[in-house]
Amino acid sequence: MLEAALLHLVKGIVDEPDQVRVSSRSTPRGEVLEVRVHPADLGRVIGRSGRTAKALRTVVAALADGRQVRVDVVDVDR
């Protein structure tokens, strides 16, 4: 559910919604949601001073219902 919600939010922000990928993996410290977008959309997802990324993390944390979830925006150029 978190993965689908994050995918929907990010697709609404970017210019290339077909290039958005969200993957989930479990770690001992909780779940990690990795967001991959087209390189031209990376700045749009991160936002000025990281505000958009912080807002996405806040929404996901609220939906997580107490579970430990981390959202990482991955730079696919590296």
Name what the model sees in each region.
Residues 1-42, 54-78:
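RNA-contacting regions in translation and RNA-metabolism proteins
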